[in-house]
Structures are given as structure tokens and as C-alpha cells.
Amino acid sequence: MSKQSTGAASAYAACVPHVPFMNIQARDRNAGFWNAYEAQAARLRRFDPELVFVFGADHYEGQHLKSMPTFMIGHAAHAIDDWGGFPGRLDVPMDIARACSEFIVEAEFDVSISYAMVVDHGFSGILHHMLGAVDAKPVVPIFVNALSHPRPKFKRCRQLGDAIGRFAAGLGKRVAFLGSGGLSHDTSDIFPQVFETQNEALRDFLIYGGAKGALTPERWRTELNAGLVEVNKLQEQKTPGVGAAKPEWDEMFLRRLTSEGVGAFDAWDDAEILRTAGNGAGEVREWIAALAAATAAGASRITVEYYEAGSCIGVAAAVVHAQ
């Protein structure tokens, strides 16, 4: 039986990676990670949230460079059937999403909104694994650009999360905040910056999403998936240099996150992170926003439940939670 709302807000947060490889490899290859992940999912289900805010990234499936938002709040959304993702329509409570957008604008954030938001595994993976399905709970999806230059400042991501948390605290509900992505990894060979690639077809797709040029969304996905299958073989064999994490960077981030809080990264320089931890490490913006939101909504201690640099999923495997 679901818990009855007491009218008093309470908050929960979890942050985990969303890399597709974790969904196609046998779970016993990464048993420690999955044990920690499933324990966190069980904890979330016991919390039984009445509302979920999920902070996720996109991999040129829903957002393209013809008009790339820095932040976006989905008022309606569906997840595509991409590699490592789980398709379906998200149960977005439009009235709450709209009220959240209004609150955020009053907080002086000029966010984008979408009534037809398309999300990929960057959102659907965490919803599926944490809650059982992408539509298991009412959810407001928050896109944070972590892939395309220029990315938002870490301070701004924290401030956005803080504002969303203050909005959520006023709802009188049990609210979960999920951060999807990270930690250290590099995907620049797969997702280059548009001004760095000489491949005209790829450049057109990054900008137009298949509306112009030789790459259709179907062909893009087919070719991307084929490449990822080959990379996955190398990762499962633990080929040196393939999918290598940066444990020194990860451990520094997690140590500061738990000891200093989300404000510790306000002055971080994006170029330095790209150099030392890879362009995928920028997805910790989603973690910072989610944990800032949870903190503003009443969560306290941030805890690292699991970390492993040597997994074969292509990123450092970590599970972080706050409540």
C-alpha cells in the first residue's frame, strides 16, 4: 500500500551513471555496482515518492545544435528506444511542470520549456532501473546541457537545482531528485564538438538531427549502435586505454561532494575538467543540480554508497544518495 501524504515535504536523491554498456553486459560482470544500484532502488521505492524530478543529459537524440537549450523543463515527454534506453511516455504532471517553470522564471532563470520533449537513455535508464518503468511515477524531466560547448557553469547548475528544490519543498509531497550521468569518461570520438569534426554528414546531424543531410535518425542510431557494440567488446576484455576512468579525479570529486557539499564546485573551470576527466565528466552537472535540489528540499547528508574505477561499463561506476 502506498504511503499517504502527510502534507509535509520530504526529499530523497540518488545519482548514478547512465552509460548504455551497463544495460547490455551481464550483471555479474559488474556485480558490486549492480548490488549497490539495486539497494538504492529499493530504498527509493520504500521512500515511495509522490513526485520525481530527473536531471538528465541528451546525446543528440532529442536536442540538436540548430537550437540547443542550456536548461529545459519538460511539460510532456517521451523516451525513444535508443541503445541502453527504455522507450515510453513519461507521466509528466503538466500542471506541476508549468508551475515549476513559472517559479524558475521568477527566480531569474530563463529556461526553455517543451511540450514534446524527446529523451534518451540519459533519462530513461535511471527511471527504469530506479522505479521499474519510465512511467512508474509522476516525473518532471530537467535537461541540463553537459555535452555541447558552451556548457553551463557549475554554479548555475547548483543554483538551478536549489531553485527547483525550493519549489518542490512548497508542494508538501515526498519528492525524489535523480541525477543521471558521470563520472569520468570521454566520448569525444563519438560525440565531437560540431566545430571540430570534418565529417559533413555528422556535422549536419549534430545541427539538424536528420532534417538535413545524409544521416537520418535511423541511420545515425544504427551506425552509433554498431560502433558501441565493438567498443563494448573491447571494454569487456578490459583492453588498455578503452573506457578508462580517471580515479584520482573521481575520488577528488566524491570527497569534496561529501565533505564540502554541492557549492564546492561553483568556481570549477570546464576546460580543466575536459582535460583531466574527459568530456563525459561534465555530466556531474546533473548530479550537482539534483543534489542541490534535494538539499534545498530538506535532504541532509550526501553519501557515496559505491565507487569502482575498474569496471568494464565505460565509466567510473558510482552510486551516491542523500536523504
Stretches found by the model and what they are:
Residues 1-49, 65-159, 170, 192-323:
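Flexible, D/E/H-enriched segments
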Residues 161-166:
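Internal active-site segments that recognize and position negatively charged phosphoryl groups
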